[in-house]
């Protein structure tokens, strides 16, 4: 398939809308992550902060509501053959029904952008949007009852069915929660500054603290990126959920530690800044990701930090026995849908099965390389029970010398404990990623 050319326009409104169309096209057809693609465009173009906010809002609104938006477009038009026209209809439909927009203005702008894409499609675009606007209630009533939840909330039907099995009492709340907005969170290095000093700096840059967990703060804006403490690495992007996985590793001075699926390195850095291991070995299976770990090592200069190219399912290749192992598993990523909403459309039920097998292989390899008395923290950024509770149950049954340990979770973090002692960072936490954490000791 020939890749579509990027669109360019002459008018300011046209330029922004065309950039939005190109970003969405990259996400849906070139399989780029939304947050990465947005940052890429923002680094290349001189947008104002207001424009960045608008672009981010439109892109996320389209992606998070894609199934429902496409349903409305399919009901309101004949088959849309032009890919960029389809993206334009998606953007405009999102504005009409999910954003505080002037309907007439949205349709007028769509016509102006259509002129740049293909002037022969202007009439089609205008007519399609007017039909959708006029007939939305009728189209809503035509959604089959057994598919309503999946279409309206934009979840694949197989996943809706799975959630009903895993969480029969609150699956709808979970679905709704992970369609909400995400928040910027950062962690400051407590070795470089106090909490009071960091909070004082936030006030100086007109940034409000929305929520915090220890050294992780959720912020009202991105002003922190312009500060020296961010540029020099004393403050890094990290979610409190992943921080808690590291915190529960509870490394003692002089211990040998493995971060088995380490890239891009945020958890490895947290281990080095929170604890004082004799040695931390961080590995990844992909060369380009190992380069990210090497860059982290070179930037911070920790003498006890080692980086290796290695398959996490073959940890024994390292020929090292570890006191502590962090297994932040490759997973379906359902807990980070607020930040990466596109993941839901790429995932299949077979992917969950494949991931579960891989997670078992990684754990079994880690178990072989864990010292007697050593501990593993198992974590994922998903709420899929097959990848979490069911795996931990399997490990406990297979290895009789394993015991599950209590977790240290701050009082302001709501969790859902499973029957084994593992913890899901609850969907009710407005700011935090969905995560699962379990801690096991080899006796």
Say what each PLM segment does.
Residues 1-443:
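S-adenosylmethionine
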């Amino acid at each position: 398939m020939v890749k579509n050319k990027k669109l360019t326009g002459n008018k300011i409104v046209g330029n922004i809308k065309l950039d939005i169309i190109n970003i969405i096209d990259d996400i849906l057809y070139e399989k780029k992550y939304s947050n990465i693609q947005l940052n890429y465009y923002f680094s290349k173009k001189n947008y104002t902060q207001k424009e960045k906010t608008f672009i981010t809002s439109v892109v996320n609104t389209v992606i998070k509501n894609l199934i429902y938006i496409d349903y409305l477009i399919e009901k309101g038009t004949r088959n849309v053959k032009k890919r960029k026209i389809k993206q334009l209809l998606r953007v405009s439909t999102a504005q009409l029904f999910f954003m505080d927009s002037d309907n007439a203005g949205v349709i007028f702008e769509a016509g102006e952008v259509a002129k740049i894409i293909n002037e022969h499609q202007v009439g089609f675009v205008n007519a399609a949007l007017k039909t959708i606007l006029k007939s939305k209630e009728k189209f809503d009533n035509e959604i089959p009852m057994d598919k309503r939840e999946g279409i309206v909330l934009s979840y694949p039907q197989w996943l809706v069915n799975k959630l009903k099995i895993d969480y029969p009492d609150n699956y709808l709340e979970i679905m709704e929660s992970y369609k909400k907005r995400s928040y910027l969170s950062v962690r400051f290095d407590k070795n470089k500054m106090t909490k009071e000093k960091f909070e004082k700096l936030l006030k100086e840059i007109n940034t409000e603290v929305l929520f915090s967990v220890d050294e992780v703060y959720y912020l009202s804006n991105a002003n922190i990126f312009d500060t020296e403490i961010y540029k020099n690495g004393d403050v890094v992007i990290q979610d409190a959920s992943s921080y808690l996985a590291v915190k529960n590793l509870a490394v003692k001075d002089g211990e040998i530690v493995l971060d088995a699926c380490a890239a891009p390195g945020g958890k490895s850095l947290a281990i080095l800044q929170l604890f004082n291991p004799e040695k931390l070995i961080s590995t990844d299976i992909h060369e380009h990701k190992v380069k990210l770990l090497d860059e982290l090592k070179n930037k911070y200069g920790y003498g006890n930090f080692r980086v290796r190219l290695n398959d996490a399912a073959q940890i024994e290749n390292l020929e090292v026995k570890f006191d502590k192992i962090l297994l932040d598993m490759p997973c379906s990523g359902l807990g980070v849908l607020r930040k990466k909403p596109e993941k839901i459309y790429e995932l299949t039920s077979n992917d969950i099965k494949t991931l579960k097998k891989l997670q078992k292989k990684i754990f079994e390899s880690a178990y072989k390389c864990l010292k007697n008395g050593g501990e593993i923290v198992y974590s994922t950024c998903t709420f899929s029970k097959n990848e979490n509770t069911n795996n931990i149950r399997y490990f406990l049954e297979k290895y009789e010398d394993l015991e599950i340990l209590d977790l240290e979770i701050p009082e302001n973090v709501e969790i859902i404990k499973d029957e084994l002692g593992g913890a899901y960072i609850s969907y009710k936490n407005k700011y935090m990623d969905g995560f699962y954490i379990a801690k096991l000791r080899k006796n």
